[in-house]
Regions:
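Short glycine-centered, acidic/aromatic-flanked micro-motifs in structured strand/loop junctions
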Residues: 24, 66, 194
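Alpha-helix N-cap/helix-initiation motif
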Residues: 23, 27-31, 73, 140, ...
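N-terminal, positively charged regions that mediate nucleic acid binding
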Residues: 3-52
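Active-site-surrounding "flap" and adjacent substrate/cofactor-binding loops of secreted or lumenal enzymes
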Residues: 70-84
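Short, glycine/acidic-rich hinge or "gate" loops at secondary-structure transitions
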Residues: 48-56, 163-169
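Glycine-rich, mobile lid/loop segments that gate access to catalytic sites or pores
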Residues: 3-7, 18-21, 78, 85-222
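Short, charge-patterned binding micro-sites
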Residues: 52-70
């Protein structure tokens, strides 16, 4: 009697997941921070304030537009300059300077139709967000986004503490993680982009960012 054995390859459930994080100087984050700060000041003075604020940043210019209905007396231009300065946009090399940036403000009161709708049905135009806790990290965040946030935070630290003195506020980090059977196996890719002085050699930038940012955050075993 002859027995025939056939080998069947076991398929491994493998996939890649990418997450990104931006630094405080990224235009999206800058604009969000300004809008949030205006809202905070309104609510500090009048808890019944209603705001719908949009902020745009480009070419040393900040645009603040939208609708505000509030009894609060706020200085929007002052808030904008304070936040731009706080983030670190303080010279011509960054493309934005709190000292001389142009600030255009076009704020009106909330339209009666929208006000009535809010009175009757509550705030509209809301997004639906979802999330979950997981056991991949100590803070229950997914591994990829946790690393991306840590890299972005480290990028901000080395700028503010002048460990890498020539980088500027705008930056982004991206991490791709390989998962096997639903668990992080290894880091596939780490990408970091950062604003910097024009005269800096790209090789010097890569060397400094790898040493002071990536190596300070990423586990070499991954």
């Amino acid at each position: 009697m002859v027995y025939k054995f056939e080998r069947k390859d076991i398929k491994v459930n493998k996939y890649y997941f990418t997450s990104e994080s931006v630094t405080e100087g990224h235009p999206d984050k800058l604009c969000d921070y300004i809008a949030d700060s205006i809202l905070d000041e309104c609510l500090k003075q009048d808890k019944f304030s209603r705001t719908a604020i949009e902020v745009f940043a480009y070419n040393n210019t900040i645009e603040v537009v939208g609708q505000v209905t509030s009894n609060a007396q706020i200085e929007i231009e002052k808030i904008v300059r304070e936040k731009v300065k706080e983030i670190g946009y303080d010279d011509e090399y960054t493309g934005m300077n709190y000292k001389n940036c142009e600030i255009n403000i076009n704020i009106t009161k909330q339209s009666p139709d929208i006000a009535l709708g809010v009175d009757v049905g509550g705030a509209g135009d809301q997004g639906i967000m979802f999330g979950y806790a997981c056991n991949e990290t100590d803070n229950y965040m997914p591994y990829a986004i946790n690393l991306a946030h840590k890299l972005a935070n480290r990028l901000a630290i080395v700028r503010k503490e002048k460990i890498i003195p020539y980088i500027r506020p705008d930056g982004k980090t991206q991490v791709t993680v390989e998962y096997v059977e639903g668990k992080p196996k290894r880091i596939e890719t780490v990408l970091i982009s950062t604003q910097h002085l024009a005269e800096i050699n790209i090789e010097k930038l890569r060397e400094d960012v790898k040493k002071e940012v990536i190596d300070a955050v990423i586990d070499s075993n991954m």
